[in-house]
Amino acid sequence: MKKILMILALLALAVGQSLADDASAKDSDSKGKTITVQGILVDTSCYFEEGQKGDDHDGMKACGKDCLNSGVPAGVLVDDKVYILIFPAKAFADVAGQTVEIKGDAYGDNLINPKKAFVIDKNGKKPIKLTGFEMM
């Protein structure tokens, strides 16, 4: 539990620093540029701590889903880079470990505020509902 809290604190610091860097940049576009990424949806705690990419890991069924439902930030793993989603993680809990496509505003090097999200499977793209989630 202490490790998870430490990781969350470090992520919060990284988000704050990145947003501060963006705010002080000379670029007048305060929203950031729009990007689209496609990769594996991970819970950042288990990924950064142990490299876990799926929903079921370390002998725990639905660990990724549980972590995201508890507020651990969601990320999209693209090659060796993780884009952290600036959005309530609960919106992505049901697709932990699956391939997703996220389109949104980029901040810094690895933060995305999603505007559209899709889960991708053998049948194509299905939208992920991004409404009805409150930021704390």
Model-derived regions: residue spans:
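N-terminal export/membrane-targeting signals
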Residues: 1-21
